[in-house]
Amino acid sequence: FKIEDHLIERRPLTLTAARVTEQGTELDLEGQLKLLVTEKDGAVTLAVTEKAEGINRFWLRVEAAEDEHVYGCGEQMSYFDLRGRHFPLWSSEPGVGRDKTTYVTWRSDVENGGAGGDYYNTNYPEPTYVSSRHYYLHMDTTAYGDFDFRNPHYHELQCWNVPGFIRIEAAPTFVELLEKLTAFLGRQPELPDWVYNGLIIGAQGGNERSFGIVDKSLEHGIKVSGLWCQDWCGKRVTSFGKRLQWDWHYHKEMYPDLPKHIEELHARGIKFLGYVNPYLVNDGELYAEGKKLGVFAKKADGSDYLVDFGEFYCGVVDFTNPEAFRWFKDEVIKKYTLDIGIDGWMADFGEYLPTDDLVLANGVSPMIEHNHWPALWAKCNYEAVKESGKLGQVVYFMRAGGTGSQKYCTL
């Protein structure tokens, strides 16, 4: 993604009126923005109740101390302490490298269409930070944002819409603070014991090769808890290498009788893991089924939006459409994955929702839904597992995340 903005006008708003009501304290900012400030159990919330037409960006400055340290903004892979830098918040591939001045990143940008990474590129951004002054701040938005911690006297938080609310909560210790933060955002389900009981082998190539590696590992005294075959759905050969067949059911040529082989693994105390993502290749069986049901996001002209994933095209399952959400949950994850005994999978590609000419069922701009997509994708997986009675047994793991992912993603 290449994101640019043309700023027409940026106006500072000052407080012109304040009124205490039964609901809280109402703040009027020059008649352009109205906030309701409330406090409950030590948490302060500033909720936006009114905004003037035309306001489509939002900046907030929060007082800072020169010796303050700041952490968070989701999964930031280059820096633990965010102080002294700004962090654009947009779910994406991390890219190749973390520094635009290095040769490998420059070459990747030039030769691969801007695939080089920067220090802030992450699958899992989040408009939340934790301060060494023992408070956290969360902004209720899934729009593109940029949290800037470079000024010694204030933090400047930006988002490309007006957030629903801003929440601030403090605690005497970091342990207590994180307890409060996870109570608000949600807590990851506890992992099952089997993930700790040995090696989870990643193998590809079909039954003979993949299950053969398990046999050889056991023969050499290696404790094995799982076998992960991401090509359980088949392979697709492109000009630049082997890819997966994005049609999420077991491939009867590469993995014949896979359910029976999974049963045999289970008898040996070993789990089987696969791979699923929320896109379906347009020459696959599931795409044809989904097209009849109208589960795919559209273009402005009403046709299915197809994403070019490199010599093959895929439909975007529209999780804002309740029927599409239910279909993928029940007919793809449950029927073709859980029901054949699969114990886990990589739930990939939550960070890829396109933003150009994409029309979603709920009518919300994809620029707003893009950062929300990882949480919707996690929720789809979570509900499939929970409704199957396998929560606490099955593990699906994700790279992409955002606000709301925490309680829906097992790993």
Summary of predicted features, one role per range:
Residues G186-I200, S303-V316:
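N-terminal small/glycine-rich loop or linker at the start of catalytic domains
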Residues Y79, H86, K223-L411:
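Aromatic- and carboxylate-enriched substrate-binding clefts and catalytic-loop regions
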Residues G206-E219, A324-K334:
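Short, acidic/polar
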Residues D140-A143, R150-H153, F211-V214, C229, ...:
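Composition- and surface-driven signal marking solvent-exposed, interaction-prone regions
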Residues F1-W194, I200-N207, V214-E219, G402:
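Catalytic and substrate-binding clefts that recognize carbohydrates or anionic sugar/phosphate headgroups
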